[in-house]
Amino acid sequence: MDPMIAQGALIGGGLIMAGGAIGAGIGDGMAGNALVSGIARQPEAQSRLFTPFFITVGLVEAAYFINLAFMALFVFATPVK
């Protein structure tokens, strides 16, 4: 395998994971912010706010794991000569 292709695949995979981690962190933070502000406004609505929060966090983390799969495809499926 050409070393330039391997280096490019590893750098690209690292950038993919960095972007996914940053996006997941921002998404989880925004969902947590909405949860805390909603509970601060209406403490009695806490039980109703947790379900959408966990669904949102689950979807954000699912997107991160899809990103992980694309990174693995990008890094480990490089052409071999």
Curated annotation (Swiss-Prot):
<feature type="transmembrane region" description="Helical">
    <location>
        <begin position="57"/>
        <end position="77"/>
    </location>
</feature>
<dbReference type="InterPro" id="IPR002379">
    <property type="entry name" value="ATPase_proteolipid_c-like_dom"/>
</dbReference>
<keyword id="KW-1133">Transmembrane helix</keyword>
<keyword id="KW-1003">Cell membrane</keyword>
<protein>
    <recommendedName>
        <fullName>ATP synthase subunit c</fullName>
    </recommendedName>
</protein>
<keyword id="KW-0812">Transmembrane</keyword>
<feature type="site" description="Reversibly protonated during proton transport">
    <location>
        <position position="61"/>
    </location>
</feature>
<comment type="subunit">
    <text>F-type ATPases have 2 components, F(1) - the catalytic core - and F(0) - the membrane proton channel. F(1) has five subunits: alpha(3), beta(3), gamma(1), delta(1), epsilon(1). F(0) has three main subunits: a(1), b(2) and c(10-14). The alpha and beta chains form an alternating ring which encloses part of the gamma chain. F(1) is attached to F(0) by a central stalk formed by the gamma and epsilon chains, while a peripheral stalk is formed by the delta and b chains.</text>
</comment>
<dbReference type="InterPro" id="IPR035921">
    <property type="entry name" value="F/V-ATP_Csub_sf"/>
</dbReference>
<dbReference type="GO" id="GO:0005886">
    <property type="term" value="C:plasma membrane"/>
</dbReference>
<dbReference type="GO" id="GO:0008289">
    <property type="term" value="F:lipid binding"/>
</dbReference>
<keyword id="KW-0813">Transport</keyword>
<keyword id="KW-0406">Ion transport</keyword>
<dbReference type="InterPro" id="IPR000454">
    <property type="entry name" value="ATP_synth_F0_csu"/>
</dbReference>
<dbReference type="GO" id="GO:0045259">
    <property type="term" value="C:proton-transporting ATP synthase complex"/>
</dbReference>
<keyword id="KW-0138">CF(0)</keyword>
<feature type="transmembrane region" description="Helical">
    <location>
        <begin position="4"/>
        <end position="24"/>
    </location>
</feature>
<dbReference type="InterPro" id="IPR020537">
    <property type="entry name" value="ATP_synth_F0_csu_DDCD_BS"/>
</dbReference>
<comment type="function">
    <text>Key component of the F(0) channel; it plays a direct role in translocation across the membrane. A homomeric c-ring of between 10-14 subunits forms the central stalk rotor element with the F(1) delta and epsilon subunits.</text>
</comment>
<keyword id="KW-0375">Hydrogen ion transport</keyword>
<comment type="similarity">
    <text>Belongs to the ATPase C chain family.</text>
</comment>
<dbReference type="InterPro" id="IPR005953">
    <property type="entry name" value="ATP_synth_csu_bac/chlpt"/>
</dbReference>
<dbReference type="InterPro" id="IPR038662">
    <property type="entry name" value="ATP_synth_F0_csu_sf"/>
</dbReference>
<dbReference type="Pfam" id="PF00137">
    <property type="entry name" value="ATP-synt_C"/>
</dbReference>
<dbReference type="GO" id="GO:0046933">
    <property type="term" value="F:proton-transporting ATP synthase activity, rotational mechanism"/>
</dbReference>
<keyword id="KW-0446">Lipid-binding</keyword>
<keyword id="KW-0066">ATP synthesis</keyword>
<dbReference type="GO" id="GO:0033177">
    <property type="term" value="C:proton-transporting two-sector ATPase complex, proton-transporting domain"/>
</dbReference>
<comment type="function">
    <text>F(1)F(0) ATP synthase produces ATP from ADP in the presence of a proton or sodium gradient. F-type ATPases consist of two structural domains, F(1) containing the extramembraneous catalytic core and F(0) containing the membrane proton channel, linked together by a central stalk and a peripheral stalk. During catalysis, ATP synthesis in the catalytic domain of F(1) is coupled via a rotary mechanism of the central stalk subunits to proton translocation.</text>
</comment>
<keyword id="KW-0472">Membrane</keyword>
